[in-house]
Amino acid sequence: SSFDPEQAEGTYLEKLVYLFAGLKRKQPTPAIAGLMLRGSLGVTVPEASNVSNTKTGDVFATDNAVTFTQTNASGVVLDVGAISLDSVISLSYSEIESLNQYPPITIVTGQLDTAISVARTLVQTINSTSSVISAFLDQDNAVHVKFINFNTIGNFSTTGNIDVIQSYIPVTATSRTFSAVLQATNDLNVIQSPVLGWFEVYNPYDSIASTNLETDTELRNRYKFSKSFIQTGNRESMYSALYSLSGVRYVNVQENIQDLPFEGRSAHGIVVTVLGGDD
């Protein structure tokens, strides 16, 4: 029985599936989260800075250092200065790796305007005219401007008596343990590694939970799955080969068999999505 993958266990099973199919038991993997950090321009949050979730107790460490700038940012915080009659303030923005061009958001001040009223007008103008960015006013009357799509980064600039004082920068983070559960949106919001000028952190999307060591049953099923597709079409063989790689958690293979492009896939093309992977 130790030579039959259907009955072998533990080390014997590992040796057999590696011998017959080149498969290795999948090891535990940490959880992964995308974070949004907000801080003062010029401040750097070091790599491996910790953030946590008070609901789950899980702790994540940033995967790389983050410096707050008004370029390659997901958003900015604006401070409106002293206002004079007929002064003009404007906010310009662009998306990285996009050909789209957007007109600047421009405000011309009136006789009764104050810094607060101009800030409110700027927020209203952004929210009523732009489908790309949104804005809100905080308790200090600073204007927060962010791309609506959290995956978008871009460059921001201002003219007139309005300054960029903070920015939002995205970063990925990895759990400190292999037992972290899914972190619901906005629940990773505690800064555990304080940095002067780093004010906020949150996760715009649910995280990806940790995975456990692959069990004998899971390894055996993956072995049977890989063998069942060896003699089938390219799409199935590709799926099997990718899913067998160490660290891979999810595979999706979409094929377009038509003569014309369809849903972003070229004619007779294949689009592959893979989550995880150590190779």
Model feature map: region roles:
Residues 1-279:
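Short beta-strand/helix segments in adaptor/scaffold domains that form protein-protein interfaces
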